[in-house]
UniProtKB/Swiss-Prot annotation:
Example of a GO biological process term: chitin biosynthetic process
Descriptive protein name: Chitin synthase 2
Job description of the protein: Polymerizes chitin, a structural polymer of the cell wall and septum, by transferring the sugar moiety of UDP-GlcNAc to the non-reducing end of the growing chitin polymer.
A molecular-function term among this protein's GO annotations: chitin synthase activity
Gene that this sequence comes from: chs2
Keywords from the named record: Cell membrane, Cell wall biogenesis/degradation, Glycosyltransferase, Membrane, Transferase, Transmembrane
Organism (species): Aspergillus niger
EC class of the enzyme, as a word: transferase
UniProt keyword Kinase present: no
Amino acid sequence: EIGFTRTLHGVMQNITHLCSRSKSRTWGKDGWKKIVVCIIADGRKKVHPRTLNALAALGVYQEGIAKNVVNQKQVNAHVYEYTTQVSLDPDLKFKGAEKGIMPCQVLFCLKEHNKKKLNSHRWFFNAFGRALQPNICILLDVGTKPAPTALYHLWKAFDQNSNVAGAAGEIKAGKGKGMLGLLNPLVAS
């Protein structure tokens, strides 16, 4: 759940940044209403229970609701929707409006079976993409922590040039507290 909360809290910090752009024609204080965070878990038995606990703490998930068969038909996925008012940081501390966190619209898709990453992308684009009709999609893997303004800069690349069809961000290894991560040769390289 640490990697998950690191990523989601980073996204929520980015939403806060977008909402702080008071002179923007697109963003501003209600900018959060233009963003939907879609989380896709690849298999009900595969997702870590503590990740589900984190989602439940945010109000997004309810334990015991999902069933694998309904009316004698196999269920493929379970979808939960909630607008959360709080975030969990990587230290599992709640952060809310008092820390500047804006509301966040969350769609959580818990796939019944593990069918790997490309299937999850298919779910995102074919199911949620068709329903939401987004202008821009940003895909993040769990554990990736976007810098506080990273999503703004990705969005800006699309906004400034309608011919841009894709953009990529730079990934930097986290050095850890006191740069102790540099003791790991993979991080240090």
